């Protein structure tokens, strides 16, 4: 299911920041993870692609308290048509995020992480619209999104997409403060990115999240765990939908 040794050179070229141990783990287990606290974004696992600079730029101005990175090596999805279009529309089918679950150690059971997720016509009117699927991959596109987060409740984000000949990306950033009893994460201080890069026989899926949070939530919540859960859930959602 995972990469074979013949793909090693491609991986090393695509992700030169990987150590030998990380490369071996990625080949054998299919994924690796990394996090930092109170450090700038490192993009340690970010693969080379035409969109990698866009991913970096999306975090400009952020001074994160916690950063999580994940990298998956997956089989290439089977599709009768354009693979990049299939990946792109999978990421644009934002309503399918509704009801995604994670295992809560605190409650020792499965919980819904994101619910009532939908695209909107504009940030002002906030009318629900159908998933804005496309027939070709544009270079850039964005639309507002509503979602209910298990901890932060009803929230508003902007979803941004980029397309290129070798990759597609999907980003989310909050457009209003997120509340945990009181506002704890200011507008645009929570940012996610997924980057999908087809290889010859596999698919690289990179994900990262950076959060700049207030003192209250940092005292009450272990940020690396909380936001690792969210970026992994986004990646798992894509994988489930794409395959």
PLM segments and residue spans:
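A short acidic/glycine-rich loop-to-helix N-cap element
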Residues: 181-185, 211-230
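Surface-exposed amphipathic alpha-helical segments
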Residues: 223-243
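Hydrophobic ligand-binding cavity/cleft-lining segments
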Residues: 10-150
């Amino acid at each position: 299911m995972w990469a074979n040794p013949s793909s090693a050179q491609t991986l090393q070229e695509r992700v030169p920041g990987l150590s030998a141990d990380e490369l071996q783990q990625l080949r054998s287990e299919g994924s690796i993870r990394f996090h930092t606290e109170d450090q700038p974004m490192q993009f340690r696992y970010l693969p080379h692609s035409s969109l990698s600079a866009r991913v970096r730029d999306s975090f400009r101005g952020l001074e994160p308290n916690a950063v999580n990175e994940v990298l998956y090596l997956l089989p290439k999805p089977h599709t009768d048509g354009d693979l990049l279009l299939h990946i792109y529309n999978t990421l644009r089918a934002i309503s399918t995020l509704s009801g995604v679950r994670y295992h809560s150690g605190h409650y020792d059971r499965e919980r819904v992480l994101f619910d009532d997720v939908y695209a909107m016509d504009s940030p002002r009117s906030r009318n629900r619209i159908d998933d804005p699927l496309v027939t070709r991959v544009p270079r850039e596109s964005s639309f507002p999104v509503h979602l209910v987060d298990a901890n932060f409740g009803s929230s508003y984000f902007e979803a941004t997409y980029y397309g290129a000949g070798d990759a597609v990306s999907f980003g989310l950033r909050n457009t209003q403060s997120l509340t945990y009893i009181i506002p704890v994460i200011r507008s645009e201080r929570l940012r996610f990115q997924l980057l999908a890069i087809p290889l010859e026989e596999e698919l690289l899926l990179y994900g990262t999240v950076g959060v700049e949070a207030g003192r209250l939530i940092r005292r009450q919540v272990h940020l690396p765990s909380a936001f690792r859960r969210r970026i992994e859930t986004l990646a798992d959602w894509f994988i489930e939908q794409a395959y």
